[in-house]
Each structure stands twice: as C-alpha cells, then as structure tokens.
Swiss-Prot record:
InterPro entries: Ig-like_dom, Ig-like_dom_sf, Ig-like_fold, Ig_sub, Ig_sub2, Ig_V-set, VSIG2. This is V-set and immunoglobulin domain-containing protein 2. Residues 24-137 form the Ig-like V-type domain. Residues 311-327 have a biased composition (Low complexity). Pfam families: Ig_3, V-set. Gene3D superfamilies: Immunoglobulins. Highly expressed in stomach, colon, prostate, trachea and thyroid glands and weakly in bladder and lung. Residues 265-327 are cytoplasmic. It comes from Homo sapiens (Human). The chain crosses the membrane at residues 244-264. GO terms for cellular component: membrane; plasma membrane. Residues 24-243 are extracellular. It is a single-pass type I membrane protein.
C-alpha cells in the first residue's frame, strides 16, 4: 500500500476540519481605526465556525502601552444572552444581535479620549480550537488641540537669549506647534531663532530692541487648531540697572522710616514715666531747724566775722519754737 506524502496528508486533514466546522477563524481590519471625539466607532469583526451550544463571544479592551494579558472584558455573549460590562457597558452593543451568523462587530457610541487603545474580539466554540479565534483592533479617538499655554523664560535684555514655550494638554494625534510674529515687524532671522514643532519651543538669541513684539503659537492636528499669544519686551541693559538701583533706594527709605518711627515711639514711652515728688515732711539741706530764728543764724555767723542771709527769701523762719525746750 502506497504511503501518502506528509504535506498532502496535512492538507487533506485541514480541509476535512474546515468542512466539518472544527476550525474557528476570526478576521479584523489590519489598519488602525480612527474616530472623532463624540462619534460612534464600529469595530468590525467576522468569524467562521459552526455555531453550537458552546459558542461564546467576548470583547475586551487594553489601554495603550499595556500587554494584552492586562485586558479587561467589556462585553460577553454566551448561552444566547448579551452581557455588557465595565465602564463602557452603557455605550457598547453589537451590530448584529445575536452574533450567530458570522458577524461580531462592536459598536461604541460617544467615544471618549479614554477609549483609545486595543480591542480584542475573541470567539470560542468548543471543540473548535484548531486555529486562533482572536483578532486585535487598534482604535484612536481623534481630539482637537486644547487651548495651549504660552510661557517665556530667560533674559530679555539686549544681547540676551530667551525661550518661548507652547503646549496643549489635549490633542490626538499629538499636535504640532508653530510660532509666528504678529504685526508688520520683520520675523527674526533664522540665525537668531530655533523652533521645535514637536515640543513647541522657540529659542531667540542675540535679542535686540526690534525683537520686541507679540508672538503667537498655533497648535494644529487633523481635527483643528488652537492658539495662544505672548508679548516679548526687550530692554536696554542700563534700564535693568536703573530699575535695580531704584528698588534699592526705595528699600533704604523704607528702612529709615521704620527706624525713625521706632525712635519717636521710644521717646514718647520714656516721657510717660512718673517723676519723683517730695512729701511735706521731707527736710531740705538748706532748711533752718525749728526754734532757730533767722536773727540767731545771723548772730552766730557774725561771731565768725561775716553775716549771711538765707539763700532764698522764701525760706520759712520761726521766732519761737512750738516745741518744749529741754534744759
């Protein structure tokens, strides 16, 4: 008995399996799919198999940059029933329900930026395991650029360099950036400017007074454009020094004013302290003792050869002591 060649036997076996419905084949588009923000995306998926009681369809989703093993289901069809699940459950459905005639296309309404990623269409129909029943579709939600933010850094004096930056927080595909100068002033020469359309940065070198003006950044992708503006003012270096000196003088005047205020306040507080007073019973060094008259003092002094009157006419004198004399 002649033996059949190996390749012929494999081909015959494959044909038999296909005819008998023992092979599951899933077909999806090879090109990525793009859908504008807010529209409905149709993710086409077809299959070939003999649908039986064990037929099951599953759609799942994985975010960009993550492995397929981290995908999570968004829709099931099994035992004749459809089960949407996950955060997209209210926006997913099947183009044909039940999907039992070879069409398993998924509809996703009101697409969001977070819907961008890879979608997996998987058909299971035990015991049909001969081929891979899995198809992958990459979806990108197209989003126009958001209003960009313009900023500036660096020295803006004559001869200096500065960098103008522009960036949009949203936009898919990623927008490109272009800087233009407004008005009738000439655009800086290419030798004094470097522009990066990807990062949105414009570097201006060797600034001059004519570099002053309003610059506009335009962010653009296939969904639209948005812009922001920035005014650049280039100054003479001396103006910067004068401004610094003026600020220093103002600070010095402020410090002197504070010091003068503190000194006046201190003097006022010091003047409020109470002065010492003398009571009626206090004796002065030049007062005349009770019982001694002014004439007695004069006779005593005359014995020494001179007369001396009290230093003050207001000195109280007593001619007769009211105190008893002790002999």
């Amino acid at each position: 008995m002649a033996e059949l060649p190996g390749p012929f036997l494999c081909g015959a076996l494959l044909g038999f399996l296909c005819l008998s419905g023992l092979a599951v084949e899933v077909k999806v588009p090879t090109e990525p799919l793009s859908t504008p923000l807010g529209k409905t995306a149709e993710l086409t998926c077809t299959y070939s198999t003999s649908v039986g009681d064990s037929f099951a369809l599953e759609w799942s989703f994985v975010q960009p940059g993550k492995p397929i093993s981290e995908s999570h289901p968004i829709l099931y069809f099994t035992n004749g029933h459809l089960y949407p699940t996950g955060s997209k459950s209210k926006r997913v459905s099947l183009l044909q329900n039940p999907p039992t005639v070879g069409v398993a296309t998924l509809k996703l309404t009101d697409v969001h930026p977070s819907d961008t990623g890879t979608y997996l269409c998987q058909v299971n129909n035990p015991p049909d395991f001969y081929t891979n029943g899995l198809g992958l579709i990459n979806l990108t939600v197209l989003v126009p650029p958001s209003n960009p933010l313009c900023s500036q850094s660096g020295q803006t004096s004559v001869g200096g360099s500065t960098a103008l930056r522009c960036s949009s927080s949203e936009g898919a595909p990623k927008p490109v950036y272009n800087w233009v100068r407004l008005g009738t002033f000439p655009t800086p020469s290419p030798g004094s400017m470097v522009q990066d359309e990807v990062s949105g940065q414009l570097i201006l070198t060797n600034l001059s007074l004519t570099s002053s003006g309003t610059y506009r950044c335009v962010a653009t992708n296939q969904m639209g454009s948005a812009s922001c503006e920035l005014t650049l003012s280039v100054t003479e270096p001396s103006q910067g020094r004068v401004a610094g000196a003026l600020i220093g003088v103002l600070l010095g005047v402020l410090l002197l004013s504070v010091a003068a205020f503190c000194l006046v306040r201190f003097q006022k507080e010091r003047g409020k302290k109470p002065k010492e007073t003398y009571g009626g019973s206090d004796l002065r060094e030049d007062a005349i003792a009770p019982g001694i008259s002014e004439h007695t003092c004069m006779r005593a002094d005359s014995s020494k050869g001179f007369l001396e009157r009290p230093s003050s006419a207001s000195t109280v004198t007593t001619t007769k002591s009211k105190l008893p004399m002790v002999v």
